[in-house]
Amino acid sequence: MDGAELMRKVVAGFEKSDLRPLLDAMHDEIVWKTANKHKGLFRFDGHYKGKAVVVDVLAKLSVDYTFRSFVEKEILASEDVVWGLFDVSLAFDPKGLGRPAKDIELEMAIRWKLKDGKIIEHQAFFDTASLLIQQGAMAVPVPQP
């Protein structure tokens, strides 16, 4: 399976709340880079190394978010690097945080580096301010003149 097919398979699993395709595709030494670098904004931040650690991060992510759809806009693969651009729909249900559930819409880019046909590096890119606004955790900024 090439990198583009692998990404499509993993994303199809996410739409069904099935992490098995992702878990099967992860290299034991995976490095997982989140879109958030600041502590306290989300239950995830920074970089994580190793399959067991990443599984724990995914469990934390699943506490608040349920992915509903990943609509492919573009997937490009070149040798061992794969890029995907998606329109993502998800449910935000912040258990224990005292905030109401919300429907979220985001554009997300995902970059993978592969080793031996498995994901050795994952990085996601999305507008974290938009996510915080849609979650109700941040006010919509006043437009600048």
Which residue stretches match the model-derived regions?
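C-terminal and inter-domain tail/linker signature
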Residues: 1-145
